[in-house]
Amino acid sequence: MTQVTVKELAQVVDTPVERLLLQMRDAGLPHTSAEQVVTDSEKQALLTHLKGSHGDRASEPRKITLQRKTTTTLKVGGSKTVSVEVRKKKTYVKRSPDEIEAERQRELEEQRAAEEAERLKAEEAAARQRAEEEARKAEEAARAKAAQEAAATAGAEPAVVADVAAAEPVAKPAAVEERKKEEPRRAPKRDEDDDRRDRKHTQHRPSVKEKEKVPAPRVAPRSTDEESDGYRRGGRGGKSKLKKRNQHGFQNPTGPIVREVNIGETITVAELAAQMSVKGAEVVKFMFKMGSPVTINQVLDQETAQLVAEELGHKVKLVSENALEEQLAESLKFEGEAVTRAPVVTVMGHVDHGKTSLLDYIRRAKVAAGEAGGITQHIGAYHVETERGMVTFLDTPGHAAFTAMRARGAQATDIVILVVAADDGVMPQTQEAVQHAKAAGVPIVVAVNKIDKPEANPDNIKNGLAALDVIPEEWGGDAPFVPVSAKLGTGVDELLEAVLLQAEVLELKATPSAPGRGVVVESRLDKGRGPVATVLVQDGTLRQGDMVLVGINYGRVRAMLDENGKPIKEAGPSIPVEILGLDGTPDAGDEMTVVADEKKAREVALFRQGKFREVKLARAHAGKLENIFENMGQEEKKTLNIVLKADVRGSLEALQGSLSGLGNDEVQVRVVGGGVGGITESDANLALASNAVLFGFNVRADAGARKIVEAEGLDMRYYNVIYDIIEDVKKALTGMLGSDLRENILGIAEVRDVFRSPKFGAIAGCMVTEGMVHRNRPIRVLRDDVVIFEGELESLRRFKDDVAEVRAGMECGIGVKSYNDVKVGDKIEVFEKVEVARSL
């Protein structure tokens, strides 16, 4: 950039040099001569100073006043109304930085003064406490000294008492003497009553020895001084010191008692009330007020119970009822030498962008041609030996219905290869794949596919992914972009090299000598072999014969197959295998662990099943209760019931999610039954009982099911592409919606004159201005564009001839059935009602 002197700058801004130097000095700049150089930052400082001096700084409004006026009408009886106008005015003041700083200083001063006052108060309290302690010590010392003096003079006291007694006149009332004679006889009885009363007010029963004790000897008469202390003797109203001492009075609590409530994953209303020390009816009443009608024995889920306890003012401690799970985690020991393992790579991207074709080239196998419709509908797991080492690949579907599968693939992986077609760009599933990878914290390697096409534009891909925070390495980011062609094999070696380089950076380790641990990628029900689960071993070694626990299922590994279907005896880290021998089909994403014995596996599996059932029931019940008031008074939705069977668990989940999302306020889809495997007799009976349609995705019905379908006339359909199921269900829902009546305006005629007819009454002489007027069609009579009559066109004539229709620009006579109040200037609108099919 060229340097500018003060003189040149003065010429540019058309001002004298002396004035410019004066302004620069006011702005705090060091320039004193016309030949000194002015930098860009100094120009900016000068411009800011000049703007401030010319009042631009104050051009911003410091105060905004909003005025709001609302007018309402108040009825005061009869037809009288009073207009009430409410005006509200609010002023918002923008404070300057100096005012903000002064406010902050004032708050600091107030805080400091409050702290000082608190400190002085604490010092005064401490001084008062010290003074009280010293006074107490002095009082104790004086009391001890007085006791010593009393002990020293104790010897002379009896003589003094005797002298005093001799000096007293012997003149006591007879009643006192009589009472003194009878008191020794009453004394033992009173003591027994006292003992009995004492025993009544204590929790302990007297021992046998205490019962057999000899009664105590009679005590000496009590002096009248004791009576003056507030004791009354004899009579029914007699009071004793023991009764006063042993009786406990109820004290009202000074504040609400806050209790700690332990809430597991499920809890009944009665258990929750007991922990809060309130009646169950109170909790039921409170939940009714919250809009949740419950019973005292109803099971609540953890979230609902937490909300209720917190609303009632108690502390909540969420506890996990996972003692068995914790014991299982402690028993799993991964000891041994950790070695480097192969990376698990997930291939993700939009549908038809070439993910499976790229894997085909790497594996030298034709998988894409075998997938129905050319799209991947399962998670494929393969491991490939390359020159630089082994790599395990997971291929995920790209269709929108397979969101859960893609998320599952990202969580079981180390590196994500994001395949983007160079001729298509960043698409919705591409964005979703980036979100899944970032949520799992997995590094991304971008493969820009189809670069052999002439319309390929790799720069467009970089710009699109940079907007999603995937920055190429050449732009200073951390995501390698590798141009490849799955068709020609261009750039595949560079892609594998980039993947293995990322794996080296991650330093992936595993312990092959430990028991196997992994994750379920996919599961299905095979007719000949039973439940089959595709498992990716993540750590340790899985061997044939191991007892495994997979989610809520367990079993002994009877056989293991690699991705080519060949039997193997063991599988190390990062190896995908199919295992046989489980008692059911686990959900994809469930964790697999090798346990010591079958007893432990069965115990944990049954515990998980029970917990899963409880949580599911609690949530289902809560959902029903929430909707009970919303649905009250509304028309019931039309429901399409479906029994759905698929070949693998992942496809079943994807289909259930997609079908449940269809529908609107009037129609809905309900999957009444679903599972993995072929269509059986029980599925057909379920469809018959629930009036449902049977859908089979890549599966077929057995002979018993086909017999029921034919006999009962059930609707059963087979599919192998997910698009076809969704389209058919949409069509069925559209048919259930029914149709709408739509009005089409056929023509408009303007009344020019009115005639009288003995047969039809008033006849309107009209000019057809728009469209065409038809006989025997419904009409509306409009006066000043307001509908005043709706009826039927009875007579339509032209030159005394009855006609069926009259076109625009022609005159005609119109007779309206049962209406004679036609006037000049009215418009007659002829229309028809058409039934139109509705859509979702």
UniProtKB/Swiss-Prot annotation:
Entry GO terms, CC: cytosol
Statement: the UniProt record of this protein carries the keyword Nucleotide-binding: yes
Ranges for region G4: 449-452
InterPro entries given in the database record: DNA-bd_dom_put_sf, EF-G-like_DII, IF2_assoc_dom_bac, IF2_II, IF2_N, P-loop_NTPase, Small_GTP-bd, T_Tr_GTP-bd_dom
Start-end of Basic and acidic residues biased regions: 95-143, 175-191, 223-232
Gene3D superfamilies: P-loop containing nucleotide triphosphate hydrolases, Putative DNA-binding domain, N-terminal subdomain of bacterial translation initiation factor IF2, Translation factors, Translation initiation factor IF- 2, domain 3
GO molecular function, one term: translation initiation factor activity
Keyword Metal-binding: no
Keywords assigned by UniProt, alphabetized: Cytoplasm, GTP-binding, Initiation factor, Nucleotide-binding, Protein biosynthesis
Chain spans, region G2: 374-378
Compositionally biased spans, kind Basic residues: 233-247
Chain segments carrying region Disordered: 94-157, 169-256
Highest taxon of source: Bacteria
Matches recorded under PROSITE patterns: G_TR_2, IF2
Subcellular location: Cytoplasm
UniProt function note: One of the essential components for the initiation of protein synthesis. Protects formylmethionyl-tRNA from spontaneous hydrolysis and promotes its binding to the 30S ribosomal subunits. Also involved in the hydrolysis of GTP during the formation of the 70S ribosomal complex.
Protein name: Translation initiation factor IF-2
Source organism per UniProt: Pseudomonas aeruginosa (strain UCBPP-PA14)
